[in-house]
Amino acid sequence: QATLDMIFELWADVAGVVSFHGLLRPTPHPNAPIRAAVLALHGYDDPMAPPEQLHAFQQEMTAAQADWQVVAFGGTMHAFTNPEANDPDFGTVYQPRADRRSWRMATGFLAEVLG
C-alpha cells in the first residue's frame, strides 16, 4: 500500500508508480487528481485485496483521472513475489510465474513512463 499512498503524497514529483500485491485500500484524498501513471500488479486470489476491493480501486483511479493499469494474475495470492511466502491459510504464497511476469511488466512500464 505504501507505493499507492506515495502517489498522493508525492504525486507532482513522480512519473509513475508500480504496486506489487498492494492492499488497494481507499486513498486518503479521494477527489485529488492523480498525475502519476499507475500499474497495480495483483494476485486475483489475494484475500487481502478481494475482487470488490479491486473494483473499488479501479473506480477510484478512473474518478481521479489517472493513467492506470491493473494486471490480475489468476491462481495467485498475496506476496506472490516473495520466495519466502508459503502460508496459504494466511493468503500469502509465492508464485514464480506471476513473479517473473510482474517483473517484466514493471520494467516495461517504467521504461515507458521514464522514457
Ranges and model annotations:
Residues 45-49, 78:
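Acidic catalytic loop of the alpha/beta-hydrolase fold
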Residues 34, 40-42, 46, 73:
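Short beta-strand/loop motif that positions the catalytic acidic residue
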Residues 18-21, 41, 71-74:
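Alpha/beta-hydrolase-fold catalytic nucleophile elbow
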Residues 64-115:
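C-terminal catalytic histidine-bearing segment of alpha/beta-hydrolase fold enzymes
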Residues 1-34:
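Primarily recognizes the serine-hydrolase "nucleophile elbow" in alpha/beta-hydrolase
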Residues 15, 33-38, 64-67:
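Short, proline-enriched alpha-helix->beta-strand connector loops that line the catalytic pocket
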Residues 50-60, 69:
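Short alpha-helix in the alpha/beta-hydrolase fold that links the catalytic acid
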Residues 27-30, 49-53:
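Short, charged, surface-exposed secondary-structure boundary motifs
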